[in-house]
């Protein structure tokens, strides 16, 4: 399984693993073990190996390089033949590549840093239900980032008071408000009541401002059937967008919801709840850029992507690297930004990155510079924490955004 002379094919799925072998285990042996366990291998030779062509189907560790400044840590590059994976299934992709190998005895730690998804495979996925340009056309909003707000307190409000907070924020000038990721259907606020009061707030704020407004109605539920029932009700109410927690809900549920949203004209906002369990450790788990690529294939029009300047962790260059992987068609390899492979998405629509977490109006100049126009800037406490209330907080955000955009556009002539 360690084949340094292997020439990768355009159709191979390529993976970059950061691996820390156990003391005494050679890097080549560890790399071969990763390639074997994540493809056709097992712990011993079996007689049924002779009934198939392992050369055709096995993963190959084709390169290993030491990590600068780290003792006994290596980047192992593995190539997988396309036929190992079911078309259009992120679930199967991850089950194969990361499903079992992370508990391997020969390794102290293992982290999947990046994947190269070839067009031959990415074209089998639904991708974002609509994409950036279609969303702008639906909302009739151009030339600036979109503004959002997560309603706080995240838990405990009644449906009517929740709807009131939504109305005040949208009336003040925001484009979107949002259910928190853990707002589903709890005893203090059942989902149907919340949807009804939020719909009333949407229509009232639209009538008063003349702008199209949205609220991310969280359709995440305990079963796929219940999730789709909530999405259907949101569409019947005339809501433009629903939301899903894609890691806790699962990729199968997420792709099912993405198909429904595309077929029924709903935008799909994605929250990454639970991501830090997977991506926080620097030497074990999976980098968020891999989860971001998986989401773009599984389906979503927005996804939370860190802020660089807020309360949550995020390095500027690395964050901008996976923001480009979400938005752009073609992204060149750039190790300084953590991009291990050139990625060609061909015609797959882009995903709007959402900056959210501990940001407020004083961050607006930095946010508009870092994320550009094709983004959603989402302020929770940065809106609702305004000393004069929710609506003035929304006004402050909108004024700050428009001032920054005007300063950028007109520069010294302002």
From Swiss-Prot:
Site feature Transition state stabilizer, where: 311
Main EC class the enzyme belongs to: lyase
Residues annotated as the enzyme's active site: 152, 271
Pfam families named in the record: RuBisCO_large, RuBisCO_large_N
N6-carboxylysine: residues bearing it: 178
Chain positions recorded as substrate binding sites: 100, 150, 154, 272, 304, 356
Molecular function GO labels: magnesium ion binding; monooxygenase activity; ribulose-bisphosphate carboxylase activity
Post-translational modification: The disulfide bond which can form in the large chain dimeric partners within the hexadecamer appears to be associated with oxidative stress and protein turnover.
Compartmental location: Plastid, Chloroplast
Cofactor details (free text): Binds 1 Mg(2+) ion per subunit.
Cofactor: Mg(2+)
UniProt: Mg(2+) binding residues: 178, 180-181
Annotated coiled-coil segments of the chain: none
UniProt keyword annotations, A-Z: Calvin cycle, Carbon dioxide fixation, Chloroplast, Disulfide bond, Lyase, Magnesium, Metal-binding, Monooxygenase, Oxidoreductase, Photorespiration, Photosynthesis, Plastid
Biological process annotations from GO: photorespiration; reductive pentose-phosphate cycle
PROSITE patterns given in the database record: RUBISCO_LARGE
Top-rank taxon, per record: Eukaryota
Further comment: The basic functional RuBisCO is composed of a large chain homodimer in a 'head-to-tail' conformation. In form I RuBisCO this homodimer is arranged in a barrel-like tetramer with the small subunits forming a tetrameric 'cap' on each end of the 'barrel'.
Subunit (UniProt): Heterohexadecamer of 8 large chains and 8 small chains; disulfide-linked. The disulfide link is formed within the large subunit homodimers.
Database matches in PANTHER family: RIBULOSE BISPHOSPHATE CARBOXYLASE, RIBULOSE BISPHOSPHATE CARBOXYLASE LARGE CHAIN
The protein's name: Ribulose bisphosphate carboxylase large chain
């Amino acid at each position: 399984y360690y084949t340094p002379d292997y020439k990768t094919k355009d159709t191979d799925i390529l993976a970059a693993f950061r691996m820390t072998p156990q003391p005494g285990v050679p890097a080549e042996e560890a790399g071969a073990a990763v390639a074997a366990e994540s493809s056709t291998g097992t712990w011993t030779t079996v007689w049924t190996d002779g009934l198939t062509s392992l050369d055709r189907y096995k993963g190959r560790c084709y390169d290993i390089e030491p990590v600068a400044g780290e003792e006994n840590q290596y980047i192992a590059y593995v190539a997988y033949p396309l036929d190992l994976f079911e078309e259009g299934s992120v679930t199967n992709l991850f089950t194969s590549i990361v499903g079992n190998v992370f508990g391997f005895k020969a390794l102290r730690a293992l982290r999947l840093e990046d994947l190269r998804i070839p067009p031959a495979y990415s074209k089998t996925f639904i991708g974002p239900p609509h994409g950036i340009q279609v969303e702008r056309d639906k909302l009739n909003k151009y030339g600036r980032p979109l503004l959002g707000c997560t309603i706080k307190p995240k838990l405990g409000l009644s449906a009517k008071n929740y709807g009131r907070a939504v109305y005040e924020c949208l009336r003040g000038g925001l484009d979107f408000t949002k259910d928190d990721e853990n707002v589903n259907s709890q005893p203090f606020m059942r989902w149907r009541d919340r949807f009804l009061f939020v719909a009333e707030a949407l229509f009232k704020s639209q009538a008063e401002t003349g702008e199209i407004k949205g609220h991310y109605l969280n359709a995440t539920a305990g079963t796929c059937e219940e999730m789709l029932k909530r999405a259907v009700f949101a569409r019947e109410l005339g809501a433009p967008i629903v939301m899903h927690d894609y890691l806790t809900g699962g990729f199968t549920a997420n792709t099912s919801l993405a198909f429904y949203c595309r077929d029924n004209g709903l935008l799909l906002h994605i929250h990454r709840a639970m991501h830090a369990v997977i991506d926080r450790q620097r030497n074990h788990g999976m980098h968020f850029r891999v989860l971001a690529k998986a989401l773009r294939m599984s389906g979503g029009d927005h996804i939370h992507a860190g802020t660089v300047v807020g309360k949550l962790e995020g390095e500027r260059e690395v964050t901008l690297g996976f923001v480009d992987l979400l938005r752009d068609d073609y992204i060149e390899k750039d190790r300084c930004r953590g991009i291990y492979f050139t990625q060609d998405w061909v015609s797959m629509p882009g995903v709007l990155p959402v900056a959210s977490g501990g940001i407020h109006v004083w961050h607006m100049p930095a946010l508009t510079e870092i994320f550009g126009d094709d983004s959603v800037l989402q302020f929770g406490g940065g809106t609702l924490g305004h000393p004069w209330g929710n609506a003035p907080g929304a006004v402050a955000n909108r004024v700050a955004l428009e001032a920054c955009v005007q300063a950028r556009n007109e520069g010294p002539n302002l």
